């Protein structure tokens, strides 16, 4: 397809109409590169994709895709063994997450028979291990502390050191308030300093980092915090080094998968592009045209896409029709009709919806040529006629029977008689070459050519004689006629002058009467057709309204079912919580053994009435909802005991799940994690007691870490931990108390000695913590 036609018809402006619908940079790049195609199967595939997307919107009301940055350059850098920065890794993380979401979305689609999009969905690949590792990068482009143990250690030390510096400086603010110009802690060159009055600079020993512009304030780093600030500076350098190491490791993880990730990114961008095409079609009442294989071109109620309130027109370019000649005066909309045909064909061949009604057809041209407007070349000193003729000669040399040719004011710019003769000769050459042509002209001689010549048809633009203005309605089959006499009469020209003028053109009066009759018949036919279309539109509106009501009803029904299920679940949860509270109180106040409490709990559960709910439609629906939320590979999760995010990577034969949490792999049962919804992620509060379940030959086992706790806090957590361990039938537990001053260790020992359910306890082996940990046997 020649590029000149794209400029002449302003095709790039048409493409810009789709920009507001795009969410990904990849789809924007695809739109920028979009050009008309010349192969029918490729065009058909594009149309099928839009039809598939329409089905998705009908069934699901939406097709969610997040904004994605282009990762093309980042992937190229990976291929060159370069390391990516945090923002580049975050962009790739979003692509991985969006790929996983799209795979899950596709697996949940029902009642849709795809023609093309299924292949795109099925070519998407998941990377659960990578997703799990990349949870260490949050959405703000920050590395979480759990990205590595070393980073966590550095940041913990950094936090402690900064807290100590703040505390020392806060104390000095109180003690040295009279020496300070402001009661605040300032920062200079990354160091925490105090703003000291210049007259008292010798009263506070330390390092001077800055002096105010007025010279009245000196910013001093007190000697008491110099060492700590140096430690903070070193820790920040260590933090940057460790972050760089982690980014290098993440880059290495991505390198083997560059090709697949690039393919995923392209698919996501293309799906976004198809979504944009559908939304453009829906908002502009456009349609997907059929593709004819016999050069037939039918446009029903076609509109110019770049006009604000375009008039819709019908155009029928049958397979045996070679040329349509639009005659009549200027300013009637002839050029707009010419451009509308060209743009509709360009849009259709680019795989875009056409601004026309259903039933429209396009054909596939290898080239579209146009001579529109004044393309006079001042540099070449050519006249308007010469400029047009040079262009027309070029078109005639290049056009073939697989081309569409558009001429605006063919033969204009020279002697009318010679111009008309040239126009007819050019049209005749194109007709004999079987090249489809639409031409506009104001030469009356071409009316006769259109009437007398086979496979050529006249057309004109309607003119309202009452208002003396064009209506821009296209009248195919009706040649244009001059309205000069009617206009002159209405503008007040003397009747005898108008009569004399008519007598002078008596030879053309019969032709004009025939044209007038044809116009009247065309108008009547159009009125009837408009009425039929109005009825059709009413029927369509009714059908849409019924469908919309049905969809709303289905949606509301599903919401009610979900609400009923949630309410029922809340009631059950409330009852179970109350029973747990009662049992806890009993355990605190009695001599009941843990296994007796568990038996009692089971008896309480048995009190619930056994009702056959197999035929209950509401609960059956609820079960389906619950089943639809079963964990799947690639799901994001919250590990309950840690409060940290991870990603499911695989399911074991025994039903347990493997998950990637930062750089750590974990094996979890389903009750040890909760799913994070894609569109409604819930914030999870980190629990203060970290319990890590392990497999042990003596039965379930748990661990409690009391290091860094205050004595009272540690004893409360120990008491709660032992209670929970007994209720969960733990056979053996580990308590990590550290060595330190020995206060917490002694408190743990005293507590265990007096607890009636502790069978035995002893320090851990030397290789498992030694005297810093105690192993407890419960019973």
Curated annotation (Swiss-Prot):
Span of domain Smr: 704-779
Family annotation (SUPFAM superfamilies): DNA repair protein MutS, domain III, P-loop containing nucleoside triphosphate hydrolases, SMR domain-like
Molecular function terms from GO: ATP binding; ATP hydrolysis activity; ATP-dependent DNA damage sensor activity; endonuclease activity; mismatched DNA binding; ribosomal large subunit binding; rRNA binding
Role summary: Endonuclease that is involved in the suppression of homologous recombination and thus may have a key role in the control of bacterial genetic diversity.
Family named by the database record: Belongs to the DNA mismatch repair MutS family. MutS2 subfamily.
The protein's name in its UniProt record: Endonuclease MutS2
Source organism of the structure: Streptococcus pyogenes serotype M49 (strain NZ131)
InterPro entries listed in its UniProt record: DNA_mismatch_repair_MutS_C (IPR000432), DNA_mismatch_repair_MutS_core (IPR007696), DNA_mismatch_repair_MutS_sf (IPR036187), MSSS (IPR046893), MutS (IPR045076), MutS2 (IPR005747), P-loop_NTPase (IPR027417), Smr_dom (IPR002625)
Keywords noted in UniProt: ATP-binding, DNA-binding, Endonuclease, Hydrolase, Nuclease, Nucleotide-binding, RNA-binding, rRNA-binding
Enzyme class: hydrolase
Quaternary data: Homodimer. Binds to stalled ribosomes, contacting rRNA.
Matching NCBIfam families: mutS2 (TIGR01069)
Enzyme Commission code: 3.1.-.-, 3.6.4.-
Gene Ontology biological process: mismatch repair; negative regulation of DNA recombination; rescue of stalled ribosome
């Amino acid at each position: 397809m020649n590029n000149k036609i794209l400029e002449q018809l302003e095709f790039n402006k048409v493409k810009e109409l789709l920009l507001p619908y795009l969410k990904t940079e990849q789809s924007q790049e695809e739109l920028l590169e979009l050009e008309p195609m010349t192969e029918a199967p490729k065009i058909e595939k594009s149309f099928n994709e839009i039809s598939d997307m329409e089905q998705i919107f009908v069934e699901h009301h939406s097709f969610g895709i997040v904004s994605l940055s282009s990762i093309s350059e980042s992937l190229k850098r990976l291929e060159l063994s370069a390391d990516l920065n945090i923002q580049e890794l975050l962009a790739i993380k979003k692509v991985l997450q969006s790929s996983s979401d799209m795979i899950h979305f596709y697996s949940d689609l029902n009642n849709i028979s795809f023609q093309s999009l299924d292949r795109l969905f099925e070519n998407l690949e998941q990377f659960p291990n990578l997703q799990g590792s990349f949870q260490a990068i949050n959405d703000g482009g920050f590395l979480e502390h759990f990205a590595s143990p070393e980073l966590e250690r550095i940041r913990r030390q950094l936090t402690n050191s900064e807290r100590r510096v703040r505390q020392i400086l806060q104390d000095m603010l109180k003690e040295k308030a009279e020496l300070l110009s402001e009661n605040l802690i300032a920062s200079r060159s990354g160091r925490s300093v105090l703003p000291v009055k210049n007259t008292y600079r010798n009263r506070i020993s330390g390092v001077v980092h800055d002096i105010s512009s007025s010279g009245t304030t000196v910013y001093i780093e007190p000697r008491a915090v110099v060492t700590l600030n140096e430690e903070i500076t070193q820790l920040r350098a260590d933090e940057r080094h460790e972050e760089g190491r982690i980014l290098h490791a993440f880059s290495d993880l991505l390198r083997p998968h560059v090709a697949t990730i690039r393919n995923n990114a392209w698919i996501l961008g293309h799906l976004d592009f198809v979504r944009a095409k559908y939304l453009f079609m829906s908002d502009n009442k456009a349609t997907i045209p059929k593709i004819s294989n016999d050069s037939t071109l039918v446009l029903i109620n076609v509109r110019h896409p770049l006009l604000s309130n375009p008039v819709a027109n019908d155009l029928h370019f049958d397979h045996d029709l070679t040329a349509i000649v639009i005659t009549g005066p200027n300013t009637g909309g002839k050029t707009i009709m010419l451009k509308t045909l060209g743009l509709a064909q360009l849009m259709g061949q680019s795989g875009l919806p056409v601004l026309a009604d259903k039933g429209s057809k396009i054909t596939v041209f290898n080239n579209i040529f146009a001579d529109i407007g004044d393309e006079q070349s001042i540099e070449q000193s050519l006249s308007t006629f010469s400029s047009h003729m040079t262009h027309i000669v070029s078109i005639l040399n290049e056009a073939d029977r697989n081309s569409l040719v558009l001429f605006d004011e063919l033969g204009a710019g020279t002697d009318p008689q010679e111009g008309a003769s040239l126009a007819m000769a050019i049209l005749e050459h194109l007709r004999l070459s079987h090249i489809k042509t639409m031409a506009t002209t104001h030469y009356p001689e071409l009316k006769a050519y259109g009437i007398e010549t086979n496979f050529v048809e006249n057309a004109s633009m309607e003119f309202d004689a009452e208002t003396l203005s064009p209506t821009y309605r296209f009248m195919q089959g009706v040649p244009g006629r001059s309205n000069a006499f009617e206009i002159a009469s209405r503008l007040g020209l003397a009747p005898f002058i108008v009569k004399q003028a008519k007598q002078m053109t008596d030879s053309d009066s019969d032709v004009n009467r025939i044209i007038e009759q044809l116009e009247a018949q065309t108008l009547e036919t159009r009125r009837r057709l408009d009425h039929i279309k109005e009825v059709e539109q009413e029927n369509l509106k009714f059908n849409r309204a019924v469908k919309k009501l049905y969809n709303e009803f289905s949606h509301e029904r599903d919401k009610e079912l979900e609400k009923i299920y949630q309410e029922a679940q809340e009631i059950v949860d409330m009852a179970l919580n109350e029973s747990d509270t009662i049992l806890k109180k009993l355990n605190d106040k009695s001599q009941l053994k843990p296994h007796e409490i568990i038996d009692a709990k089971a008896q309480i559960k048995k009190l619930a009435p056994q009702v056959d709910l197999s035929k209950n439609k509401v609960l059956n629906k609820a079960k389906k909802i619950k089943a639809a939320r079963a964990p799947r590979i690639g799901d994001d999760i919250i590990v309950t005991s840690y409060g940290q995010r991870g990603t499911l990577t695989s399911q074991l034969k025994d039903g347990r799940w493997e998950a990637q949490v930062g750089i750590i792999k974990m094996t979890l049962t389903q009750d040890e994690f909760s799913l994070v919804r894609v569109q409604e992620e819930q914030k999870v509060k980190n629990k203060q007691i970290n319990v890590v379940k392990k497999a042990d030959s003596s039965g379930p086992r748990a661990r409690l870490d009391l290091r860094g706790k205050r004595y009272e806090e540690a004893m409360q957590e120990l008491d709660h931990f032992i209670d929970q361990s007994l209720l969960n039938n733990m056979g053996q537990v580990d308590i990590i108390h550290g060595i330190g001053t020995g206060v917490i260790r002694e408190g743990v020992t005293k507590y265990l000695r007096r607890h009636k359910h502790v069978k035995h306890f002893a320090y851990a082996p030397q290789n498992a913590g030694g005297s810093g940990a105690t192993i407890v046997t419960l019973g």
